[in-house]
Amino acid sequence: MKPFLVTLAVLLLFFQVTAVGSIEKCWNFRGSCRDECLKNEKVYVFCMSGKLCCLKPKDQPHLPQRTKN
């Protein structure tokens, strides 16, 4: 039982360390939260942290076009 608990503790510590250095993701993990978007990215929504959710054009949702009546 002791080796199991030690292994579990090491794995939990490993996952916490790697999560700190990762970039915050948004829009179903398709976008990245940044202060400024890259040249080929566009802003679609805001992240929970207040940063911009930057999406590449291929990952942006297709919005319906308004039709004139």
From Swiss-Prot:
Gene3D superfamilies: Antimicrobial Peptide, Beta-defensin 2, Chain A. Pfam families: Defensin_beta_2. GO terms for cellular component: extracellular region. Residues 1-19 form the signal peptide. Disulfide bonds join C26-C53, C33-C47, C37-C54. Keywords: Antibiotic, Antimicrobial, Defensin, Disulfide bond, Secreted, Signal. Has antibacterial activity. Belongs to the beta-defensin family. This is Beta-defensin 122. It comes from Macaca mulatta.
